[in-house]
């Protein structure tokens, strides 16, 4: 057996579980923690780094720049948020962008993928108390205001 995390080895040998059923829930917990810490750093106007994700707050402009693997994926200010794909339309990039949208945009706004293409879901208003959204092609530099 190859080297694996002790808990996974235990579950394979004792309980018969396979690593593939365990890795995704564990990964999603880690991702949510990183994204929560990322959002907290932006709220507190602080520099922060964990793993492949970093936040740098520029006090002069009042903008927090979020990077994934060193590539800029977002600029967050008090008034708006600009998103980028950083050159990689990956699951992780999309996850980070959606965590930012969940925190700093209107509920329901975000980035999604359909047939290998990225799209942005943008709030445009409310009709009879119901939120209305439009879907637009994703472009690096898209601004949520």
Q: Which functions belong to the PLM regions below?
A:
Residues 6-7, 28:
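Compositionally biased, intrinsically disordered low-complexity segments enriched
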């Amino acid at each position: 057996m190859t080297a694996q995390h002790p808990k996974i080895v235990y579950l394979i040998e004792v309980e018969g579980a396979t690593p593939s059923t365990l890795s995704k829930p564990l990964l999603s917990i880690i991702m949510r923690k990183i994204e929560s810490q990322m959002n907290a750093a932006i709220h507190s106007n602080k520099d922060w780094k964990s793993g492949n994700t970093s936040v740098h707050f520029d006090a002069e402009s009042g903008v927090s720049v979020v990077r994934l693997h060193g590539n800029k994926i977002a600029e967050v200010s008090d008034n708006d948020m600009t998103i980028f794909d950083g050159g990689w339309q990956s699951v992780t990039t999309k996850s980070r962008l959606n965590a930012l949208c969940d925190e700093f945009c209107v509920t329901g706004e975000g980035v999604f993928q359909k047939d290998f293409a990225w799209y942005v879901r943008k709030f445009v208003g409310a009709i009879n108390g119901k939120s209305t959204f439009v879907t637009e092609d994703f472009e690096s530099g898209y601004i949520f205001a």
